[in-house]
Amino acid sequence: MSGHMNGSPIVTLTPAPTLDRTYFVSDLVSGAVNRADNVGEELAGKGINVSRGLHLAGVSAPGIIPIGNSDPSVLVRTGSAEFLMPLWVDGTLRVSTTILEKGGTTTKINETPRPLSHDDWNAVVELTEKTVREQGAKWLVIAGALPTYKDSGEFVSLQPIFDKMHELGVKTALDTSGAPLGYWGRQGAATVMKPNAEELAFLVGRNLTTIGDVISAARELNGHGVEVVLASLGADGMVAVTKDHAWSARTAPVKVINTVGAGDATLAGFLSAVVSSPIQPGEDDFGVGYNVPLGLKTAVQWGATAVTQPTSGLTSVSNLPEGFLNLNPDFNELLDEPATGKPH
């Protein structure tokens, strides 16, 4: 890997990366033959997208990825070699297919993550710890789907990573979904978690129809030990919740082209702000030691920018739309997009 100097404030881990193949079509007709106007290909995965976004903003964030050794040219071919650290494992790289219609409608078909052997996963854990130590990183982002172990079919364990990061005084941000989201949410092992409204509703087992519902659901995660919950609410913007504070933020409406990767952009935006603007002596540390409201405001700006771009990874973080931060959210405000919490 090239382009890294010691001293990256953030390291990312994408446990199950994917080759994102996007077909651009005028209108998708189900059950018929459709012709693609164009096809794009990029190496993707939530942690990769976070690293790519931070890299664009001038924040070094090396990304660790266990990657199938059957496609050795993929890093160079997708222009990802500069900021990714591959750990070559047996097998192929999974493919995610996105069909993007002219009107902005997005259809996505994701392959299941490739299972890993215990040895391969242990090597991922070791490389993660080594990289965080060498970089002197303050944050580790674990993002995306989790693979399972080849022999048992159980999800790989993040506990050794959380234990090591806790030992090193490194903060962790976790963005995953499904059963692992529920499990690790209840463990309270991560410093920051970033569920969307549907995931949060599923996690607490009830519908979320107001901003207050979202905040009280997030407080359940705070109660388990999660320091900050960043809940993305689609058109309703985003809230950040700690045990003592809650903020909401949004931007003016933007023209939506592609929603895939918007959540990753918000997490990258949050982290770019908190590492670039550390709390100074005498300033409010919001009870956590980093500037959560600034991070939240930046998160919605980056997320709004991401949905106006055709790829799942950010291509630019210049000309950001204005962000509006609400220091006292209205708990009774109805969500434009209520969350039912039904599993997908």
Residue ranges and their predicted role:
Residues R52, V95-I99, G237-V241:
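Short beta-strand scaffold segments in enzyme catalytic cores
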Residues I10, S60-P62, F83-M85, T172, ...:
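Hydrophobic anchor at the start of a short beta-strand
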Residues R35-R94:
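Substrate-binding N-lobe of the ribokinase-like
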